[in-house]
Amino acid sequence: MNSLNINLLYIAATIMMGLAAIGAAIGIGILGGKFLEGAARQPDLIPLLRSQFFIVMGLVDAIPMITVGLGLYILFAVAS
């Protein structure tokens, strides 16, 4: 592989991991805001909302973890 292709792989992996982190941060911020909004409107449903919040937060966090794994694979397995 020539150096231009390797440099493009480094840039692609970096952009992929960065955008995944930014997307997760925005998603968790929106999710937390909606949780607080729902808890303020109906305090009786806080246990139900909390369990749903943590399930969805785990799903939102799983996507960047997978993306970081793929990015590291590109950096260390494909580009070397």
From Swiss-Prot:
Entry keywords, A to Z: ATP synthesis, Cell membrane, CF(0), Hydrogen ion transport, Ion transport, Lipid-binding, Membrane, Transmembrane, Transmembrane helix, Transport
Location in the cell: Cell membrane
Disulphide-bridged cysteine pairs: none
Membrane topology category: Multi-pass membrane protein
Classification via InterPro entries: ATP_synth_csu_bac/chlpt, ATP_synth_F0_csu, ATP_synth_F0_csu_DDCD_BS, ATP_synth_F0_csu_sf, ATPase_proteolipid_c-like_dom, F/V-ATP_Csub_sf
Main location: membrane
An example Gene Ontology molecular-function term: proton-transporting ATP synthase activity, rotational mechanism
SUPFAM superfamilies: F1F0 ATP synthase subunit C
GO cellular component terms attached to this protein's record: plasma membrane; proton-transporting ATP synthase complex; proton-transporting two-sector ATPase complex, proton-transporting domain
Keyword Membrane attached: yes
Sequence similarity: Belongs to the ATPase C chain family.
Name listed for the protein in its UniProt record: ATP synthase subunit c
Functional summary from the UniProt entry: F(1)F(0) ATP synthase produces ATP from ADP in the presence of a proton or sodium gradient. F-type ATPases consist of two structural domains, F(1) containing the extramembraneous catalytic core and F(0) containing the membrane proton channel, linked together by a central stalk and a peripheral stalk. During catalysis, ATP synthesis in the catalytic domain of F(1) is coupled via a rotary mechanism of the central stalk subunits to proton translocation. Key component of the F(0) channel; it plays a direct role in translocation across the membrane. A homomeric c-ring of between 10-14 subunits forms the central stalk rotor element with the F(1) delta and epsilon subunits.
Record text on subunit structure and interactions: F-type ATPases have 2 components, F(1) - the catalytic core - and F(0) - the membrane proton channel. F(1) has five subunits: alpha(3), beta(3), gamma(1), delta(1), epsilon(1). F(0) has three main subunits: a(1), b(2) and c(10-14). The alpha and beta chains form an alternating ring which encloses part of the gamma chain. F(1) is attached to F(0) by a central stalk formed by the gamma and epsilon chains, while a peripheral stalk is formed by the delta and b chains.
One Pfam short name: ATP-synt_C
Keyword Flavoprotein: no
Site (Reversibly protonated during proton transport): 61
Chain segments annotated as transmembrane: 11-31, 54-74
